[in-house]
Amino acid sequence: GQERTLEDVERLRAQLGLDQNFFVQYYRFLEGAVQGNFGVSFRQGRPVSEILLERAPATLELAAVSGFLAIAFGIALGVFTAIRRNGFAANAIMTVSLIGVSLPTFLIGILLIYLFSVELGWLPSFGRGETVKIGNWTTGFLTQSGLQALILPAITLGLYQMTLIMRLVRSEMLEVLRQDYIRFARARGLRERAVNFRHALKNTLVPVITVTGLQLGSIIAFAIITETVFQWPGVGLLFINAIQFVDIPVMAAYLMLISVMFVGINLIVDMLYFAIDPRLRADRTGAH
C-alpha cells in the first residue's frame, strides 16, 4: 500500500525473492515447479499450487462437459451430413454450423445469456451454482443449481469445437465413401449401416483424432474467455485476474501447466493414432 515504508518494500521483495537477478529467479522457479511448488501469489499471499488446485475442478468439469458435447454431437452430425449430403436437413445443418464457426466465443456467450437468462430467465447468467465437496474436489454435478449453471458455459465453449469436428468428420467421411474398398463392401451385399459405421466411420476417425485431441486441449487453454463472460471460478478467470493485478507467479504457473498439458495430449493422440490405424501397427510388425 501507499503507507508502506521503503524498508517494508525491500523486506517484502527479499521475502518473495525479487531482489535476486533474473537468472536466479528463473532457476528457483524451475526448481520449485519440478516439485509442484510455483511460489506464492503476490496478490493472495498463498501458495500458487494451492490456489490452482482450488480452481482446477471448475475448469476441468466445464472442459469435460464441453468436450463431450463437442465430440458426441460433432461426430454424429458429421456422419449424418455426410450420409445425407444431398438432403435438406444436412444442408440446413451445414448452413447453421457457419454461425458456430464464424461468431466469436464471447459473443455467443453474451447472446445465450441475453436469451436464456435475461429474456426467458431459465438459466443463471454467472457463477458455478451450489457445489458439493468430495475430498479435495468440488463438483457441481450433484446439485440442480450446479448443473443449470454449467449449461450455458458448456455450450458456449463447445459450440465452436463441435462445428469444427462436424465439418472435419463430414469432409473426411465423404472422402472415405469414395474409396474402392467401400464400393467393394457394398458390392458384397453388406448393409448400408455396416458400410457406413463399421468401415467408413472407423477410417474417418483416424485423421480426425489428431485435430480433435488438439481441440480438447484448446478447450482448457482457451476457456479464459468463457470463464470471464460467465464469471466461472476456474483457472482461466484466475489467469485473467492475475494479469490485472500483475500476479506473475500465478501467470507463470498457468502458462507452464497449459504447455505440459498440450505435450501430454499430443502423446495420448499419438498412442490413439497407433491403436486405431492398422497400417502403423503393420509397419512396426514388418520392421521387426
Per-range role (PLM):
Residues 56-89, 105, 133-288:
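Alpha-helical transmembrane segments of integral membrane proteins
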Residues 1-27, 116, 120-143:
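Hydrophobic alpha-helical transmembrane segments of membrane transport/permease proteins
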Residues 20, 28-31, 96-127, 149, ...:
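Membrane-water interface segments at the C-terminal ends of transmembrane alpha-helices
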Residues 19-75:
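An internal, D/E-rich "acidic patch" concept
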